[in-house]
Amino acid sequence: MKRKAIIFPYNAECASLVRNRELLLNHEIVACVSPIGYGLQGKDAAYAYGGENTGIVISDKKISEINFDDLLVCESSSDFDTFIMPQVKLAAECGKNVIFLYNISQQQKKEAEETCKKKNVKCVVLTNRRMDTDKLFEHEIIPLSVPVVFVASVIENTNKFDVQLGLRKFLQEEGYKVSQIGTKEYCELFGFHAIPEFMYANQLSEADKIVCLLYTSPS
């Protein structure tokens, strides 16, 4: 049985979770909650990104009034101490787990983890995979015997992640085994890996990044 999840603070940045909610491995989205200042209350979740109605109405209820198992905290411009931590504390007090869908600072992580630990609930921070690249430099290109598909764009906000999920769904429905690396930290919620952190590192050459990626790609 899938775990009931609330998305907070719901905004266009985490719209992929709603648009592709049927692909989530272990979660069922039961509510999207936004602060009053977002101006989204009472509107369909699709209003945030201009899509077709989803049937999920954005709420400004206290999360304690909703039946759920996990609080999915998505990236936003909202102040962490003013908006995010009060909801984390409330979720913990209700005995619910907290999952951050983006990387937060060490201080923020410590505060959230300590808050959850006091109430014996989990606090998980999903991030890009960190790896020791020094162990990967065998400098031998591994031959690939399967097709490789890249999804890329020259600008932001082109729904790349939705395209990645759409391709995944199509190929799996066609009977293919799909090994995938995605561009969002929360790829694991959909059953595949987030892009490794070293791909964003300046200290590695583009050639070295390719070699490392080949050795860390899931089979």
Where in the sequence are the language-model features?
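N-terminal pre-Walker A segment at the start of P-loop NTPase domains
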Residues: 121-133
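Conserved small/polar residues in nucleotide/adenosyl-binding loops
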Residues: 215-219
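Walker A (P-loop) phosphate-binding motif
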Residues: 137-174
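Short beta-strand-centered segment that lines the nucleotide-binding/catalytic pocket of NTP-utilizing
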Residues: 175-188
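Flexible loop/N-cap segments at domain edges
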Residues: 211
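P-loop NTPase switch/communication element
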Residues: 186-205
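Long, basic/Gly/Ser/Thr-rich N-terminal segments
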Residues: 1-120
